[in-house]
């Protein structure tokens, strides 16, 4: 057996941030575009942009900034606030996952080997 963690953050009962939304920001940062991030997630550009605007509205900060045109076309990058949100969420998630695994091991003990009983 192995524990799994599904994590999200709410503000006043409204979903603000989650693993899925963190992944979207990460893909945008890596590809340099909302379209590229959306494609990696299997989303339309419109849906990805809508998710970003929803997070920004709920948190009251800008997460991405876009530059239009130029020799290589436009580019989108995370704002310092977007980078900080992503870094803090990753850190929080890693700590929550480590705690969960520790608590799981304490509650269920080590996995059985070759049909041996599990020892707590």
Where would I find each of the regions flagged by the language model?
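Short, Lys/Arg-enriched N-terminal segment that forms or immediately precedes the first helix
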Residues: 1-13
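Residue cluster at the C-terminal edge of the helix-turn-helix DNA-binding motif
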Residues: 57-62
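Residues within the DNA-recognition helix of helix-turn-helix
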Residues: 51
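Key DNA-contact positions within bacterial/archaeal DNA-binding proteins
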Residues: 46-47
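Central "turn" residue of the DNA-binding helix-turn-helix
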Residues: 42-43
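Basic, amphipathic "hinge/linker" alpha-helix immediately C-terminal to the N-terminal HTH DNA-binding motif
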Residues: 66-89
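Short helix-boundary/capping micro-motifs
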Residues: 28-39
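Alpha-helical linker/hinge and terminal dimerization helices associated
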Residues: 88-106
């Amino acid at each position: 057996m192995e524990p799994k963690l599904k994590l999200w953050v709410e503000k006043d009962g409204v979903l603000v941030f989650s693993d899925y939304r963190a992944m979207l920001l990460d893909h945008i940062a890596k590809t340099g575009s909302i379209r590229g991030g959306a494609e990696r997630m299997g989303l339309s550009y419109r849906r990805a942009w809508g998710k970003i605007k929803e997070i920004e509205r709920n948190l009251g900060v800008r997460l991405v900034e876009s530059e239009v045109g130029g020799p290589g076309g436009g580019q989108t990058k995370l704002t310092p606030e977007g980078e900080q949100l992503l870094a803090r969420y990753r850190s929080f998630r890693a700590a929550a996952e480590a705690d969960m695994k520790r608590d799981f091991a304490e509650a269920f003990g080590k996995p059985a080997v070759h049909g041996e009983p599990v020892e707590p």
